[in-house]
Curated annotation (Swiss-Prot):
Pathway where this protein functions: Protein modification; protein lipoylation via endogenous pathway; protein N(6)-(lipoyl)lysine from octanoyl-[acyl-carrier-protein]: step 2/2
Protein encoded by which gene: lipA
UniProt organism field: Anaeromyxobacter dehalogenans (strain 2CP-C)
Keywords: 4Fe-4S, Cytoplasm, Iron, Iron-sulfur, Metal-binding, S-adenosyl-L-methionine, Transferase
EC number, UniProt record: 2.8.1.8
Class of this enzyme: transferase
UniProt catalytic activity: [[Fe-S] cluster scaffold protein carrying a second [4Fe-4S](2+) cluster] + N(6)-octanoyl-L-lysyl-[protein] + 2 oxidized [2Fe-2S]-[ferredoxin] + 2 S-adenosyl-L-methionine + 4 H(+) = [[Fe-S] cluster scaffold protein] + N(6)-[(R)-dihydrolipoyl]-L-lysyl-[protein] + 4 Fe(3+) + 2 hydrogen sulfide + 2 5'-deoxyadenosine + 2 L-methionine + 2 reduced [2Fe-2S]-[ferredoxin]
Subcellular location: Cytoplasm
Assigned protein family: Belongs to the radical SAM superfamily. Lipoyl synthase family.
Identification of the protein by name: Lipoyl synthase
Primary localization class, coarse: cytoplasm
Length: 294
């Protein structure tokens, strides 16, 4: 398909004082962001609001998912042991109260980078008042790696299902499977019940509505509490084409179906991404309510 984008996919041009401050601070501290690396359409809204999704473990991924614009290689550069410290310094300088930390996949590392991720979480948690959401790799489903991240006590743990079961082999790298993602999410909720669990689905890749609802049910059955759904947008001619531009009305219907299935919050819209600011605002209130003394 990939015809002309509909009007509801127009985005704001990045700008503003807060946007520039976030951009320059992250650039100065040599931190990679999904906002820039993946050409996120919400960069103006998020950076302008003083938040960002920061990417750990470099900007080269060991997987080649057919929807993703991040660079790939079998053997990326070695990890920078100072990266967690640099990250905490950047967030402290920006004065944020909520940060989303994600990463590339690092299948070349024995633990998939779990210890590096956990180090970053612990350093960030030392910043007073900061809530930490992590969007991690699946660590090839390794329970020990998932446990390492859980023990670092993130406030929110996300791992993205990305698409429906039928399309997973065509959309995601062969190392990533539908059930592996569900297993990682289930383990986190089972072993660390205080951590809010979250996942995301892209639509417009040729899925059927019933398949999206089935994926929602699978996520709920594995303890996922927060769901985001957004339109797949093709990053380049080398990536999967858009099969359909899903209407705002259908996104609204997906939201209603998700809430009926028991998700505590569903962000569903054409420009929604997994690290979506509206979901962040809900999560902040949710976490604070869980931690208040009763």
């Amino acid at each position: 398909m990939d015809a002309k984008k509909p009007s509801w996919l127009r985005v704001n041009v990045p700008g503003g004082e807060r946007y520039q401050k976030v951009r320059e601070t992250l650039k100065g501290l040599q931190l990679h962001t999904v906002c820039a690396e993946a050409h996120c359409p919400n960069v103006a809204e998020c950076w302008g609001g003083g938040t960002a999704t920061v990417m750990l473990m470099g900007d080269v991924c060991t997987r080649g998912c057919r929807f993703c614009n991040v660079k790939t290689a079998a053997h990326p550069p070695a990890l920078d042991p100072d990266e967690p410290r640099h990250l905490a310094a950047a967030i402290a300088e920006l004065g944020l109260d909520y940060i989303v930390v994600t990463s590339v996949d690092r299948d070349d590392l024995p633990d998939g980078g779990a210890a590096h991720f956990a180090d970053a979480i612990r350093r960030l948690k030392e910043i007073p008042g900061l809530l930490v959401e992590v969007l991690t790799p699946d660590f090839r489903g390794d329970p020990a790696a998932v446990r390492t991240v859980g023990r670092a006590a993130p406030d929110v743990f996300a791992n993205n299902l990305e698409t429906v079961r039928r399309l997973t082999p065509a959309v995601r790298d062969a190392k990533a499977t539908y059930d592996q993602t569900l297993g990682v999410l289930a383990q986190m909720k089972r072993e660390f019940p205080q951590v809010v669990t979250k996942s995301s689905i892209m639509v417009g890749l040729g899925e059927q509505e019933a398949e999206v609802v089935e994926a929602m049910r699978d996520l709920r059955a594995n303890g996922v509490e927060i769901l985001t759904l957004g339109q797949y947008l093709r990053p380049s001619a080398w990536h999967l084409p858009v099969v359909e531009y899903v209407s705002p009305e259908r996104f609204a219907a997906y939201r209603d179906q998700g809430l009926a299935l028991g998700f505590r919050y569903v962000a569903s819209g054409p420009l929604v991404r997994s690290s979506y600011r509206a979901a962040e605002l809900f999560l902040r209130g949710e976490i604070e309510s869980r931690t208040k003394p009763r």
